[in-house]
Every structure is written in C-alpha cells, then in structure tokens.
C-alpha cells in the first residue's frame, strides 16, 4: 500500500508536505507521504501546491533523506525567505506517474475520501468517511474513519465486502462490537475523552466545595 496525503486532485497526488526551512540557501524539510522514495531519484521536476494559490512546477536541484523525511532543494529557491513561502505546501506528481503497485495493493490516495459502510445482511450502515490511514499500529494498516466519532478500522481482506474507488465507497463486514465504545480508539479520541472526563470530575469537585 502506498501512502499519500489526503490532499489530492484528480490529476495529481501528494508525495510530501513541506514543513520547515533547512539550512540557509533555500532547502526545505518535507514530511514523506510515499512508500516509494525512489520517486525523487527519478524526477527532475516536481509540482508544489500552496495552501492558497496555484500549483506550480519547480526544478529539483538536489534532495537527501533526513530524520524520516526528505530535504528538497529547488532551483530558484535560494534564501530562507524564499523557502518560507513554500511552507505547508504539498509536493506533488502527476497521478499517471505514481509507482506501480503489486497485485492486491491499494493506494492510500484511493482510500481517503471514501465513505465506509458496515454491512449486516441486506442493510448498510454508514460509519463515516476515511480521513487517513495509520500505519503505526502493526501489520494491518488502520483506516481513520470520521463520522459521529472517530474509528480505527483494520484494512484487511477478511473484513472487506466490496470497494468502488470511482464511487468512493467501501463496504465491510465487521466483527460484532468493533464500533462500540469499547473498541480501540485513536490517540486523538483518547485525549478528547480524557479531557471531557477531567472537566466532568473538576465540575463535580467544585460542586462539593
């Protein structure tokens, strides 16, 4: 499975996001969103899409991998001020140029934005929309699904009933109880619930005074 950012268009996919300046001559440190770092070796030009503004093509002068990310040096970006203008931009390539996957593998960019439905017999219950994919939990990637609450759902063949990436729809048959409150929570959801519990406890203590 190739990981890419959720920020994609029909014609481009994001392979990195620029996070900070690096050095004094225009280099930028970028978070990787691809399992295929050789994409940077194969290309002399990349596309940069800022948070606000138009996508533009830049010539890649140099790159090296550093602390789990990649440092990029673009032609024409020569100073820290130049580099700061690229912060939070998406680094993209044309969709047609993305790496070929092994049979049965899936691009994260295809998963993100899909509506996920839990199937019970002939009934389909919408769980939410896939916002991201978490690879840090173990062998099986977890779909980060946001609906009434956030769920982490293993993306495994045994749960899959059907996928239609053109229609942005995934159907799954999930084990009983997986979507209940005692199901595994993401770190963000745990922190939110802890914060709510702390506020409730503090309110109770104030009433006792």
UniProtKB/Swiss-Prot annotation:
Transmembrane segments: none annotated. It comes from the Bacteria. This is Ribosome maturation factor RimM. GO terms for molecular function: ribosome binding. Keywords: Chaperone, Cytoplasm, Ribosome biogenesis, rRNA processing. Belongs to the RimM family. Pfam families: PRC_RimM, RimM. It comes from Koribacter versatilis (strain Ellin345). Residues 184-209 are annotated as: Disordered.
């Amino acid at each position: 499975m190739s990981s890419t950012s959720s920020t994609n268009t029909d014609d481009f996919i994001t392979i990195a996001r620029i996070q900070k300046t690096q050095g004094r001559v225009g280099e930028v440190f970028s978070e990787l969103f691809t399992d295929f770092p050789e994409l940077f070796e194969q290309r002399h030009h990349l596309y940069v899409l800022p948070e606000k503004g138009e996508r533009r093509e830049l010539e890649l002068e140099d790159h090296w991998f550093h602390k789990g990310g990649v440092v990029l040096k673009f032609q024409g970006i020569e100073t820290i001020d130049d580099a700061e203008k690229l912060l939070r931009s998406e680094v993209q390539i044309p969709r047609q140029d993305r790496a070929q996957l092994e049979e049965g593998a899936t691009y994260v960019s295809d998963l993100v934005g899909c509506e996920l439905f839990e199937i019970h017999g002939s009934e389909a219950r919408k769980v939410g929309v896939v916002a991201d994919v978490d690879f840090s939990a173990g062998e099986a990637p977890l779909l980060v699904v946001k609906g009434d609450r956030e769920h982490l759902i293993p993306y495994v063949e045994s749960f899959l009933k059907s996928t239609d990436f053109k229609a942005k729809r995934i159907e799954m048959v999930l084990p009983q109880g997986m979507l209940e409150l005692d199901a595994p929570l993401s770190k963000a959801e745990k922190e939110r619930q802890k914060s709510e519990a702390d506020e409730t406890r503090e309110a109770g203590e104030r009433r006792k005074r």
